[in-house]
């Protein structure tokens, strides 16, 4: 469409999908990139289509992150400051709130950089790295893809997403060298042998000064359950509709999340609330069930308030793990003659942490387009203009001879 006198094109740049549960092919549940059946349920017709190439919808987190970096790089390299025809930006939307259609082997959607419970996947953190600036990168960031809990004999590539100019990897304080840089943001360290401990990635700027750092630590055996609550900053309201997210994690004895834990957690709820449950890989996706497995050591469930305020106590138990308990309270809302004027959205504040739009330029010109005035061709000179006339339907051709196959 036209905006003023300029052409504006909107496009979807990455529709691939990946289950959050699938780290990589080197750790549980050992999912190779693209592995799965060749079918998907169409969002348009709601029919299952067989014998289609569904590999793009069956990523693991390693390959899903890499794909997101590659696809965004296609637009980032054409950002403002790189000529007259540029990408003006991007926004990340997801389709993870449905279990009525799917693509790939699972029977619910795995689209987007978070799952349906808004638990981040690795591409979420990759986008934090790539999008930390109005146009040009302003704040260098770094993220190590995956986890650091493997069997002793595993040798695997380690991927790091960073906006630094150089990235060095350290394992228990020993340097493993600098990563191979591709697509500006992706650094690959090939054939890294697993050793328990601390894996660190350090980013350096163009002057060789450290500008960002990230680390992964090997977690111990699963020992305990941890519960926490995510709710509105204004509190949980007893209006019969307000909901909170209950987060459950499996931790080691030192309080580190166990990235390979998939324990089945049983929940008990006491008090004025309705259990709405979460979602996980399985025949029925555990919809509404009070038995819910963690995936990669974490999951979430929704709890809805009733119209009666009060204290709600939730207990979580699992075989072989120390149980956990948490209490939360819902606050009353004013009701007159059976009606309430309370609208939850009225209390939500916009997130303005990014700050005001800058008044000064947010990018530097790195490339300037120059208009072509004329061209000289080895043949068919009268059609040489077709090589730069901005018409995709026209083209210049030579006369079929090698010695005339040139144009300047």
Predicted regions: what is each one?
Residues 2-9:
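Short, small-residue-biased leader/transition segments that mark boundaries at the very start
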Residues 10-240, 253-258:
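Substrate-binding clefts and catalytic carboxylate motifs of secreted carbohydrate-active enzymes
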Residues 144, 272-276, 372:
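A structural signal for short, hydrophobic beta-strand segments that form beta-sheets
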Residues 153, 162, 241-243, 381, ...:
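Short, surface-exposed loop/turn motifs at beta-strand boundaries within globular domains
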Residues 155, 298, 404-406:
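Short, solvent-exposed beta-strand edge segments and adjacent coil->beta transition regions
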Residues 158-159, 169, 174-362:
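Core sequence-specific DNA-binding domains of diverse transcription factors
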Residues 347-408:
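Disordered, acidic Ser/Thr/Pro-rich linker "stalks" and the adjacent N-terminal cap
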């Amino acid at each position: 469409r036209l905006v003023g006198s300029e052409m504006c094109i909107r496009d979807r740049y990455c529709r691939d999908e990946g289950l959050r549960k699938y780290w990589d092919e080197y750790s549980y549940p050992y999912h190779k990139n693209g592995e799965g059946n060749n079918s998907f349920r169409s969002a348009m017709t709601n029919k299952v289509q067989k014998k289609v190439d569904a590999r793009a919808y069956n990523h693991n987190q390693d390959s899903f992150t890499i794909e997101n970096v590659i696809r965004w790089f296609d637009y980032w390299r054409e950002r403002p400051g790189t000529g007259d025809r540029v990408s003006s930006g991007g926004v990340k939307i997801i389709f993870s709130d449905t279990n009525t259609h799917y693509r790939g082997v699972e029977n619910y959607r795995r689209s987007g950089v978070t799952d349906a419970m808004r638990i981040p996947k690795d591409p979420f953190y990759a986008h934090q790295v790539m999008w930390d600036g109005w146009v040009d990168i302003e704040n260098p960031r770094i993220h190590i893809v995956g986890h650091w809990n493997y069997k002793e004999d595993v040798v695997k590539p380690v991927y790091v997403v960073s906006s630094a100019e150089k990235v060095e990897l350290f394992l228990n304080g020993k340097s493993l060298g600098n990563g191979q840089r591709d697509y500006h943001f992706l650094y690959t360290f090939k054939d890294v042998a697993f050793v328990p401990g601390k894996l660190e990635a350090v980013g350096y700027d163009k002057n060789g000064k450290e500008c960002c750092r990230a680390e992964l630590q090997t977690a111990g055996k699963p020992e305990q359950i941890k519960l926490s609550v995510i709710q509105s900053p204004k509190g949980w309201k007893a209006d019969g509709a307000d909901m909170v997210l209950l987060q459950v994690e499996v931790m080691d004895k030192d309080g580190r999340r166990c990235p390979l834990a998939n324990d089945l957690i049983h929940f008990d709820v006491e008090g004025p609330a309705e259990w709405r449950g979460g979602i996980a890989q399985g025949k029925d996706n555990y919809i509404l069930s009070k038995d819910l497995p963690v995936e990669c050591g974490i999951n979430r469930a929704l709890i809805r308030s009733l119209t009666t305020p009060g204290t709600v106590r939730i207990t979580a138990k699992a075989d072989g793990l120390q149980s956990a308990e948490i209490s939360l309270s819902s606050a009353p809302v004013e009701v007159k003659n059976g009606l309430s004027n309370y609208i939850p959205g009225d209390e939500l504040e916009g997130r303005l942490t990014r700050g005001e739009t800058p008044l000064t330029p947010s990018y530097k010109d790195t490339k300037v387009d120059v208009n072509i005035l004329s061209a000289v061709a080895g043949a068919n000179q009268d059609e040489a203009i077709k090589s730069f006339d901005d018409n995709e339907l026209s083209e210049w051709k030579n006369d079929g001879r090698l010695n005339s196959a040139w144009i300047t």
